[in-house]
C-alpha cells in the first residue's frame, strides 16, 4: 500500500498496539469466549499488517484460514464445553503448574538469548534471491514458495514452531 510516511507509521503503531492489547486480552481475560474474540482481533490486525506491507495474498490467507476457520473452530469448541469448570479452583496452583511455567520461562529466555546472540548475517542460505534468473517466467505461487524457502525461511520456521506449541496447548487443554 503506497501511503505517505507519517500515515504509514501511524497505522503501524496503531496495528501494533492492537496486536499487543489483543494478545493481553487473550491471556488475561477469564471468559474463554472473550479470549477467542480477542484472538480473532489479533488475527485481523496481523492481516492488516500484511496489507500494509503489500502482501495481499498472505493477508487473504491469514483472513480465510486463521480468522475464518481456526478462530471460528475455537469459538465453537469453547461454546460447547462446560463453562462452569473454568471458574472453580481458578486461584489454586499445583506443583505441576509452577514447574511447567518455570520450564516455559527458561525455554523462552534461552530462545531470546539465542536469537540475540546469533550473527544472522553470517548464515548461508541455500539459495539467494539473485540466483533466480527467470523471475518473469515464474508464477506468483512459485515466487511465494521460493521466497518462503530463501529470504523468509527463518520467520516461516518460527511460525511453524508457534503453531506446534499452540496445537500442543490445545491438546493439553482438551485432555483435562
From Swiss-Prot:
UniProt-listed InterPro entries: NAD(P)H-Q_Oxidoreduct_6, NADH_UbQ/plastoQ_OxRdtase_su6, Nuo/plastoQ_OxRdtase_6_NuoJ
Pfam families reported in the protein's UniProt record: Oxidored_q3
Record's keyword annotation contains Repeat: no
Catalytic activity: a plastoquinone + NADH + (n+1) H(+)(in) = a plastoquinol + NAD(+) + n H(+)(out); a plastoquinone + NADPH + (n+1) H(+)(in) = a plastoquinol + NADP(+) + n H(+)(out)
Transmembrane segments: 10-30, 32-52, 61-81, 92-112, 152-172
EC number(s) on file: 7.1.1.-
Gene3D superfamilies: NADH-ubiquinone/plastoquinone oxidoreductase chain 6, subunit NuoJ
GO MF annotations, alphabetized: NADH dehydrogenase (ubiquinone) activity; quinone binding
Swiss-Prot/TrEMBL keywords: Chloroplast, Membrane, NAD, NADP, Plastid, Plastoquinone, Quinone, Thylakoid, Translocase, Transmembrane, Transmembrane helix, Transport
Its membrane topology: Multi-pass membrane protein
Subcellular compartments: Plastid, Chloroplast thylakoid membrane
Presence of keyword Thylakoid: yes
Gene Ontology CC entries for this record: chloroplast thylakoid membrane
Role summary: NDH shuttles electrons from NAD(P)H:plastoquinone, via FMN and iron-sulfur (Fe-S) centers, to quinones in the photosynthetic chain and possibly in a chloroplast respiratory chain. The immediate electron acceptor for the enzyme in this species is believed to be plastoquinone. Couples the redox reaction to proton translocation, and thus conserves the redox energy in a proton gradient.
Family label: Belongs to the complex I subunit 6 family.
Quaternary structure and partners: NDH is composed of at least 16 different subunits, 5 of which are encoded in the nucleus.
Protein name: NAD(P)H-quinone oxidoreductase subunit 6, chloroplastic
GN (gene name): ndhG
